[in-house]
């Protein structure tokens, strides 16, 4: 897969902030993709050798039946420290290496992390989407920023996630009696559509099947 918006990878937080502030203005939070969707992908990360080696996994699944079509792994030295709010700079270089091996181009990528639900509105899903010019969705297991009202226990229930008066995502129940996930637009997809695809990719478990397959690969399980 071709990188649409390449940039140098920063060595400092200050450089990373500059890149985030530049790229955030290129994020599109409206639906700009061809339907029907045929393939969805998940990306996830693992680390080896005390975090010095990054192991990125990508899984491409058919849609809507969610059968695994293709998986790939890529390894590279970790070049950026673990700092909340800047995880894309630590993870995306290896993710791009894994995606470069993909033969079946996905229509949408679901990322294990944030989209615009990020202090500078550029979490890993938005960052990756802008770089690849492809629709992406952030599906995070934990809250980074924002507040929301109490959520009903039924599957499919959701509440808007609000930060500084702006709706930046949704807290979404994907399974009855289980912790919710935090969904946000990554790139080229609206929040209602992102919620719809996340629900359609979570037929049995809390996390999307795309994430589950990629996580097993990245974790070497």
From Swiss-Prot:
It is found in: Cytoplasm. The record marks 82 as: Interaction with target DNA. The keyword Metal-binding applies. It is an enzyme of class 3 (hydrolase). One of its GO terms (cellular component) is cytoplasm. Its cofactor is Mg(2+). Keywords: Cytoplasm, DNA damage, DNA repair, Endonuclease, Hydrolase, Magnesium, Metal-binding, Nuclease. It holds the Pfam family Endonuclease_5. Mg(2+) binds at residues 44, 112. It catalyses: Endonucleolytic cleavage at apurinic or apyrimidinic sites to products with a 5'-phosphate. One of its GO terms (molecular function) is magnesium ion binding. Its EC number is 3.1.21.7. One of its GO terms (biological process) is DNA repair. It comes from the Bacteria. Belongs to the endonuclease V family. DNA repair enzyme involved in the repair of deaminated bases. Selectively cleaves double-stranded DNA at the second phosphodiester bond 3' to a deoxyinosine leaving behind the intact lesion on the nicked DNA. This is Endonuclease V. It comes from Nostoc sp. (strain PCC 7120 / SAG 25.82 / UTEX 2576). The lineage of its organism: Bacteria, Bacillati, Cyanobacteriota, Cyanophyceae, Nostocales. The gene is nfi.
């Amino acid at each position: 897969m071709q990188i649409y918006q390449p940039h140098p990878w920063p060595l400092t937080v200050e450089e990373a902030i500059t890149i985030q502030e530049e790229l955030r203005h290129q994020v599109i939070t409206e639906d700009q993709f061809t339907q029907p969707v045929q393939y969805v992908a998940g990306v996830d990360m693992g680390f080896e050798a005390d975090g010095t080696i990054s192991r990125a996994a990508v899984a491409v699944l058919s849609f809507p039946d969610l059968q695994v079509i293709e998986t790939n792994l890529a390894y590279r030295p970790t070049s950026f420290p673990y700092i909340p709010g800047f995880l894309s700079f630590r993870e995306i270089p290896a993710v791009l290496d894994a995606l470069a091996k993909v033969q079946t181009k996905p229509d949408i990528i679901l990322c294990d992390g944030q989209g615009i639900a990020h202090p500078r509105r550029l979490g890993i899903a938005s960052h990756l989407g802008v770089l690849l010019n492809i629709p992406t969705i952030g599906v995070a297991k934990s809250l980074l920023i924002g507040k929301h009202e109490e959520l009903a226990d039924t599957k499919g229930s959701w509440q808007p996630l609000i930060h500084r008066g702006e709706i930046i995502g949704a807290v979404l129940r994907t399974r009855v009696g289980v912790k919710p996930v935090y969904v946000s637009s990554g790139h080229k997809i609206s929040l209602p559509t992102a919620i719809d695809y996340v629900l359609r990719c979570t037929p049995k478990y809390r996390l999307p099947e795309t994430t589950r397959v990629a996580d097993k690969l990245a974790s070497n399980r």
